[in-house]
């Protein structure tokens, strides 16, 4: 399926010069959304993921249905200060700002094979931080799956040898 036709591009959002890739047009189309999740599930099975991790917030709308499709667990990687139990956190740079992510200390078991799922790979700051958190807990990141990749921002350079699947590239 050509998923690019389901992505709306919004100029100058959230600030001038940014061309925001809006996935809500994909999400609202049931057959396209389902097909996107199923395509990513093929990749997740290939890398033999034990669990899916998704960074807040749009990683939840990719990762949770992906884990459901596969019948495996989902680990939410939250914004700092949002988790009620003991957690670890790490700071990172966004395409247009700064933030911090956190995960519960018992969310991932040592040796667990983790696939990271998110809507977008841009500069790589979010994925690099998510990998860092998972590895701190002893997890093995076996892949990263995205609806969209902004290849001109070279986020792949922050991932190393981890296999990547992106449905749409800009």
Swiss-Prot record:
GO terms for biological process: adenine salvage; AMP salvage; purine ribonucleoside salvage. It is found in: Cytoplasm. The keyword Transferase applies. It catalyses: AMP + diphosphate = 5-phospho-alpha-D-ribose 1-diphosphate + adenine. Pfam families: Pribosyltran. Its main location: cytoplasm. Keywords: Cytoplasm, Glycosyltransferase, Purine salvage, Transferase. Its EC number is 2.4.2.7. Belongs to the purine/pyrimidine phosphoribosyltransferase family. Homodimer. PANTHER family: ADENINE PHOSPHORIBOSYLTRANSFERASE (PTHR32315:SF3). Catalyzes a salvage reaction resulting in the formation of AMP, that is energically less costly than de novo synthesis. This is Adenine phosphoribosyltransferase. It comes from Brevibacillus brevis (strain 47 / JCM 6285 / NBRC 100599).
């Amino acid at each position: 399926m050509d998923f690019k036709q389901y992505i709306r591009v919004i100029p100058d959002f959230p600030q001038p010069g940014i061309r925001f890739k809006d996935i809500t047009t994909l999400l609202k189309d049931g057959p396209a959304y389902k097909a996107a999740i199923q395509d990513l599930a093929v990749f997740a099975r290939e890398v033999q993921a034990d669990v899916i991790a998704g960074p807040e917030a749009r990683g939840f709308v990719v990762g949770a249905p992906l884990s459901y499709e596969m019948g495996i667990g989902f680990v939410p990687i939250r914004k700092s200060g949002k988790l009620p139990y003991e957690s670890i956190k790490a700071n990172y740079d966004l395409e247009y700002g700064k933030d911090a992510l956190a995960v519960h200390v018992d969310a991932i078991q040592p040796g667990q094979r983790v696939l990271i799922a998110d809507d977008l790979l841009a500069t790589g700051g979010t994925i690099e931080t998510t990998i860092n958190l998972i590895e701190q807990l002893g997890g093995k990141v076996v892949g990263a799956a995205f609806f969209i990749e902004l290849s001109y921002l070279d986020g792949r350079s922050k991932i190393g040898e981890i296999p990547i699947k992106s449905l749409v590239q800009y």
